[in-house]
Amino acid sequence: MDVFNRKAMEMMTSPAEREAFDITQEKDAVRERFAMHPWGQQAILARRLVERGVPWVTVVMENPYGVGGIPWLKEGVYNWDSHAVNCHIFKDAKVRFPLYDQVITAMIEDLYARGLDKRVLLVVTGEFGRTPRLTVRPGSRTKVDQPGRDHWPRANFAFLAGGSMNHGQIIGSTDKHGNEPVDRPVKFQEVFATLYHCLGLDATNTTVKDHQGRPHYLVDAGSRPMRELVG
């Protein structure tokens, strides 16, 4: 049994770990503040895990429909893949965005109220941006034309809170169409370097060996933590 298998077994058999996953121990008011749908309850679980020393937790906000009191929406989409063939982007957003806003604001307030903001960094992001212009296609479920947005790697976002960083600022901007960066372009390698910095890792010098024993750096050459946040 290698070190990873041993750690997995310890996690599954530890009474403390089982207790961390029991979110019914949370006060009803706290659970309701986050919202009783899966996104809110998963966020509470994430906080309970970091309270117990878990260094990295991922919450995937997918499929808000049909559970937690959220009715199924024919024009909605399982994830955030808002192509016109998948969803009516405006109808989907009217359901999805208020849920997102409630969970994220509740998480930030909760972390600060518990004093966790000094050692916990909350990062909210996606895999890439969306086209500045809408496309219109027949929906795969609705069979009628509906608006959507396709993949757009030229501009994206990352929202950060906590982690003892310099917050209250917007770093970088795009043109008025959300098409291209025009001021302080930020590469995601800089974001990654910033996250490693928060974890206490020197991303510019630390390497990880692959299965052939070859060293790989954690970030691309020249990538540094964002000076606006950690300087």
Short names for language-model regions:
Residues M1-G231:
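Ligand-binding pockets and gating/stacking loops
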